[in-house]
Curated annotation (Swiss-Prot):
Coiled-coil ranges per UniProt: none
GO BP, one annotated term: adenylate cyclase-modulating G protein-coupled receptor signaling pathway
UniProt organism field: Dictyostelium discoideum (Social amoeba)
PROSITE patterns xrefs: G_ALPHA
Residues covered by region (G2 motif): 176-184
The name this protein goes by in its record: Guanine nucleotide-binding protein alpha-12 subunit
Positions of the UniProt region annotated as G3 motif: 199-208
Residues noted as binding GTP in the record, renumbered to the chain: 39-46, 178-184, 203-207, 272-275, 329
Keywords in alphabetical order: GTP-binding, Magnesium, Metal-binding, Nucleotide-binding, Transducer
Top-level taxon of the source organism: Eukaryota
Region described as G1 motif: 34-47
Region G4 motif: start-end pairs: 268-275
Length: 354
C-alpha cells in the first residue's frame, strides 16, 4: 500500500500556495483568456453565455445579468410573438377562427402593434385571451404539426404554460431568465476572473446578417466554443427559407474550424438541445432530411453519432484539437461540469507558462 508522508503533503500544499501567489501577481499583466461563442442563430449560444455568467461570483453576476423588468418585458414579447405567429400561419393550415376567437385575436394584435407601451397591466389585459387561444384545438394542431412552415421559439410551451404566473406581478425565476429569447445583435462581452486569471467571454449574433461583424472578435482567441442545435436537422433558417439550419451550421463550422484565425485555438463543439432532439426523432425521421443516414431513425445513439461524425469529417487538420459534448443548455449542472472542464484545461496551461 502506498502512503504519503507529512513532508510530501506539506510540499504539495506549499507548491499550491506558490502557484496561487504567482497567479495573483501575474493576473495584473496576463492577457485575458478569450472564449469566443460561435454558432448559427437560435442554437443556444446565448443560453450558454447566461449559464457561464451564473457560475461566477456575485459581483460578476450582478454586472452582466439584465434587470428583472427587462426580462419580464421580453417574456411578454416572446408570448405575444408566438401568438401572432400562430395566427399568421393559420390560413396555411386551412384553419379558421370563430367570430369570438377573432375578437380575442384582435385584442392581442392591438397590443402587439404597440410594444412601446407593453407592461404588466397591458399584458394582463390580454393574458386570458392568449391562454384561451393557446389551449384551442386550432393552435394546438398547428403547434404539434410535424411539417412546420414557420419558426418558433423553443421555449414557447414553457412560457405559455406559465401564463397564469405572468398575469400578475412576478419576479422572474432563473428558469425564466434562461428560457426567454432575446436575439443577440452585435457583440456581447463579459469580463471576469477565475482563480485570479482574467477571462473574456464573447457572444456574437448568429444570424447571417450579423456574421460580417465577427471578424472584429477573431484576434487572440484562446478557445472557440462552437454551438450547434442538433435538433435542427429538419428546420430552415428564419432569415433564409431555402437553406436548412443543419447545412448552415455544418458549413459555418467547416469554415471556422479550418480558418487561419484559429490555427492555434482549440475548439469545444456543443451538440446542443439534445432534450428536444430525443423527442423529435420519435416523430420525424432523420433520414427524411439527412439522406445519407441509413441507420435506425429512432436510435439516439445512432443518429447523434452520425451527426457528430458529419461535423468531425469537416476538420482538415488531423492535429486540430476539437472536443465535443452533447448538451442541453438549460441543464445548469451539466453545463457547469463542461465549463469546469474547459476552465481547468485553460488554467493548467497558464500555470505551465508561469
Amino acid at each position: 500500500m502506498c502512503t504519503r508522508n507529512k513532508k510530501d503533503i506539506t510540499t504539495e500544499y506549499l507548491n499550491s500556495k506558490k502557484i496561487d501567489r504567482e497567479l495573483k501577481q501575474e493576473s495584473t499583466t496576463l492577457q485575458p483568456l478569450k472564449l469566443l461563442l460561435l454558432g448559427s442563430g437560435e442554437c443556444g449560444k446565448s443560453t450558454i453565455f447566461k449559464q457561464i455568467i451564473s457560475f461566477q461570483d456575485e459581483a460578476t453576476k450582478k454586472e452582466y445579468t439584465p434587470p428583472s423588468d427587462y426580462v419580464i418585458k421580453n417574456i411578454f414579447l416572446n408570448i405575444l410573438t408566438a401568438t401572432s405567429t400562430f395566427v399568421r400561419v393559420a390560413p396555411s393550415y386551412n384553419i379558421e377562427f370563430s367570430e369570438e376567437e377573432n375578437q380575442k385575436i384582435q385584442s392581442i394584435l392591438n397590443v402587439f402593434s404597440d410594444l412601446e407601451n407593453l407592461d404588466q397591466t397591458v399584458f394582463t389585459s390580454v393574458s386570458d385571451n392568449i391562454k384561451y387561444l393557446w389551449n384551442s384545438k386550432q393552435i394546438q394542431s398547428i403547434y404539434n404539426n410535424t411539417n412546420r412552415i414557420f419558426q418558433l421559439n423553443d421555449s414557447t410551451e414553457y412560457l405559455m404554460s406559465n401564463i397564469d404566473r405572468y398575469s400578475k406581478p412576478f419576479k422572474p425565476t432563473q428558469n425564466d431568465f434562461l428560457r426567454v429569447r432575446v436575439k443577440t445583435t452585435g457583440i456581447v462581452e463579459a469580463d471576469f476572473k477565475i482563480e485570479a486569471v482574467p477571462f473574456k467571454l464573447v457572444d456574437v449574433g448568429g444570424q447571417k446578417n450579423q456574421r460580417r461583424k465577427w471578424i472584429h472578435c477573431f484576434q487572440d482567441i484562446t478557445c472557440v466554443l462552437f454551438v450547434t442545435s442538433i435538433n435542427d436537422y429538419d428546420t430552415l433558417l428564419e432569415e433564409d427559407n431555402s437553406t436548412s439550419r443543419f447545412t448552415d451550421s455544418l458549413e459555418l463550422f467547416r469554415e471556422m474550424v479550418n480558418s487561419n484565425w484559429f490555427t492555434k485555438s482549440p475548439f469545444v463543439l456543443f451538440f446542443n438541445k439534445i432534450d428536444l432532439f430525443k423527442e423529435k426523432i420519435k416523430r420525424i425521421p432523420v433520414s427524411q432530411h439527412l439522406k445519407d443516414f441509413n441507420g435506425n431513425d429512432h436510435s439516439y445513439e445512432e443518429t447523434s453519432q452520425f451527426i457528430k461524425n458529419k461535423f468531425h469529417t469537416t476538420i482538415k487538420n488531423s492535429n486540430k484539437i476539437v472536443y465535443h459534448h452533447f448538451t442541453c443548455a438549460l441543464d445548469s449542472r451539466a453545463i457547469e461540469v463542461v465549463f469546469n472542464s474547459i476552465q481547468h484545461s485553460l488554467l493548467m496551461n497558464v500555470a505551465e507558462i508561469l
